[in-house]
Amino acid sequence: MQLAVNIAVLASIYALICCGYVLIYRVSRVLSLAHGELMMLGAYGLYATASLFSGHPLLAVAAAGGLALAVGAAVYAALMWRMTGESVLAAVLATIALGILLRGLMVLVFGTQTQYPLRDLGWTNASFDVGGGARISAVGAALVLGTALVYGSLFAFLRGTRWGLRMRAAGQNPLLAAQRGVRLHGIYALAWALATFTGGMAGMLLASDAGLEGTLVTIGLKAFPAALVGGLDSLLGALVGSLIVAGAEVLLIHYVDPLLSDVVPFLVLLAMLVLRPWGLFGSREELDRV
């Protein structure tokens, strides 16, 4: 039972992170390799707002979420809109450069010391029994529930709202969407804002659980194989891919060797590239581009 809980928590972490990879790629066909740094920036945003709004934890969390949305839109407005119409390689290199810049700025501003935003908020990470002898921490439960809420909201948004339909149209046929009056730059900025928000949310929860330090970026990198396994243009694929990668990682750590933790996601990815290169829910048309 404890293994099942561990898989659910780790799958929620990966799903919440790779949701951003999928959103950006699905809408703008850009592969963002700065997502780990944007995730960590969201965590540092919570650390900053926790100090700024001391004694008001809910206000600090809301401010950190709003800051993540603003940062995502600003990244598109300041950099990524210039990549519209450029080659895939140029856009990917731009996100790599962005990630390096953000990592350096975060070290410069916040230093390298481990921070604990949950303590600054005045909250504790108590654990409780879920039956069968298994336990889950408060942050772990928040991760599972938060991921379910995010994906449910995104599915409803993309299928049932005007802006969601515009995002789908822009992703499927941007030229036709533009001819129909869809403002592509606004849609792309929204995709970056939502992706940074979900990534920042993952970063905030991870920092609340284990502390905030530079190695948080590597978790964002480990979530990338989950997005590829599921298919880069599918939110459902992101969920399934995250569950597969998390299940393999937890089981191999438990039964084989804990040192395999950083290797397992990429072993799963290699196996998927051999068996089904376009991912479980991806399409053959995306294979050449990926």
Description of each model-found segment:
Residues 14, 18-20, 54-66, 192-199, ...:
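Transmembrane alpha-helical segments in multi-pass inner-membrane proteins
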Residues 1-18, 45, 53-60, 86-91, ...:
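Membrane-interfacial amphipathic/re-entrant helices at transmembrane-helix boundaries
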Residues 82-83, 88-160, 187-190, 256, ...:
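Transmembrane helix-bundle core of multi-pass membrane transporters
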Residues 21, 54-98, 105, 240-245, ...:
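Alpha-helical transmembrane segments within multi-pass membrane transporters and channels
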Residues 10, 131-212, 235-240:
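Helix-loop-helix "hairpin" substructures at the membrane interface of multi-pass membrane proteins
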Residues 2-51, 78-90, 229-235:
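Single transmembrane alpha-helix segments in multi-pass membrane proteins
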Residues 109, 172-179, 183-186, 256-290:
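Cytosolic-side transmembrane-helix boundaries in multi-pass membrane proteins
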Residues 37-41, 83-107, 216-228, 257-276:
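Pore- or pathway-lining transmembrane helices of multi-pass membrane proteins that form conduits
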